[in-house]
Amino acid sequence: MLNEIFNKQKTQSEKSLEALKKDFTTLRTGKVNTHILDHITVDYYGTQTPLNQVATVLASDASTISITPWEKPLLKTIESAIAAANIGVNPNNDGESVKLFFPPMTREQREENVKQAKAMGEKAKVSIRNIRKDANDAVKKLEKDKAISEDEAKKAYDEVQKLTDTYTTKIDESVKNKESELLKV
């Protein structure tokens, strides 16, 4: 019974950590990352489709992303979807592909991204605390139903807190690593 609670807490905490790392890919660092376009969808025959499912998205160099659609008529649609996404660059349509030229990041942009990374980290910590609350509630229910003793419940609460502390530390480390990556010129 308790192992199920711990395993569930661990699985959910791991998912929160992975979600944080995925969120971090949307932050721009010193070099371009094609994941900055992951949230962009284009109208493909009446259906909103992720950009990477209708085109090849490549980082040509440290400051350029090239998007080559699999069907030429999509060029204009892709161009307008990127412009509407407001990612800080203007798309350039050369007739074959759409190119995005990212200027070097300013100190202010880097610091703004650090703030966003910290906010993402806080959101992940809130998620971890909510997972802890659910686990503690499950332990409390077992104790109330007399399925476990008071001593077992105390040990279970300690284990839940230990798992929470472990994942909170992992989140802090991830934020710190992302911060140093963002501030590196």
Curated annotation (Swiss-Prot):
Entry annotated with the keyword Transmembrane: no
SUPFAM superfamilies in the cross-refs: Ribosome recycling factor, RRF (SSF55194)
Subcellular location: Cytoplasm
Record keywords: Cytoplasm, Protein biosynthesis
A GO molecular-function descriptor: ribosomal large subunit binding
Source superkingdom: Bacteria
Primary residence: cytoplasm
GO annotation (BP), single: cytoplasmic translational termination
Any one Gene Ontology cellular component term annotated for this protein: cytosol
Function: Responsible for the release of ribosomes from messenger RNA at the termination of protein biosynthesis. May increase the efficiency of translation by recycling ribosomes from one round of translation to another.
Similarity comment: Belongs to the RRF family.
UniProt-listed NCBIfam families: frr
Protein name in the entry: Ribosome-recycling factor
